[in-house]
Each structure stands twice: as structure tokens, then as C-alpha cells.
């Protein structure tokens, strides 16, 4: 019984993770000046943030602001990477597509707001 549940959680992580990355890549296409790369496997995902579309300029300030704003909206993220410009997403294994949509919506809303500045 426990093994079966574990297998379902692993399957869920793969299915939802693939969906989540696909949705995040749609956001990346809309905001290439902010997002250089989406990477990860399963539900362990990273979003590399940059300054003005320049791959050699990591955007630590934007990453920190994004995690702090999203924390106020109930989304817990962290930063990683040598420049702390990578948004690290590590949700629980029970994370589902609705949760992914919510996180994507919050990230997109944040970037829309930043883009207006």
C-alpha cells in the first residue's frame, strides 16, 4: 500500500512537473527580458532571472523581490545559484496542476507589474 502511494506521487511529480515547466515557459516567452532559462526535473524547478535580456547579468534584486512578494500571496519560493538570481521551486509531491496554475498566475502578475515600471 505504501509503495503504491509512493509510485503515484512520483508519477504525479513527473506529470505535474512537466505541465508546470510548460506553463512557466509560456511566461518566459512573454518576458524574455526577465527570464533566461527554466530548468528542472519533476517538481524541482529553477527560473533564472536576468537584467534586460542580458544573459551575463543575473538579477538578484528581482529574484529577492519576487520571492518576498509571492510569500505575501501564500507562495513559498527561495533563491539559489552563485548570484542568488535563480528562483527555486520545490513544492510537495501532492502539488497539482491547479497549484501550478496559481503559482504561474502569481509569477506572471508580478512580472506584468514589474514590466510597467
Go through each PLM region and give its residues.
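Conserved N-terminal phosphate-binding loop of PLP-dependent enzymes in the Aspartate aminotransferase
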Residues: 1-117
Amino acid at each position: 500500500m505504501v509503495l503504491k502511494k509512493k509510485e503515484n506521487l512520483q508519477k504525479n511529480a513527473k506529470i505535474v512537473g512537466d505541465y508546470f515547466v510548460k506553463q512557466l515557459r509560456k511566461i518566459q516567452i512573454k518576458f524574455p527580458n526577465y527570464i533566461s532559462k527554466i530548468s528542472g526535473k519533476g517538481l524541482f524547478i529553477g527560473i533564472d532571472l536576468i537584467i534586460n535580456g542580458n544573459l551575463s547579468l543575473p538579477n538578484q534584486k528581482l529574484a529577492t523581490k519576487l520571492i518576498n512578494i509571492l510569500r505575501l500571496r501564500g507562495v513559498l519560493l527561495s533563491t539559489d545559484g552563485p548570484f542568488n538570481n535563480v528562483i527555486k521551486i520545490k513544492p510537495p509531491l501532492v502539488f497539482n496542476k491547479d497549484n501550478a496554475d496559481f503559482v504561474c498566475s502569481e509569477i506572471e502578475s508580478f512580472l506584468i507589474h514589474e514590466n510597467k515600471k
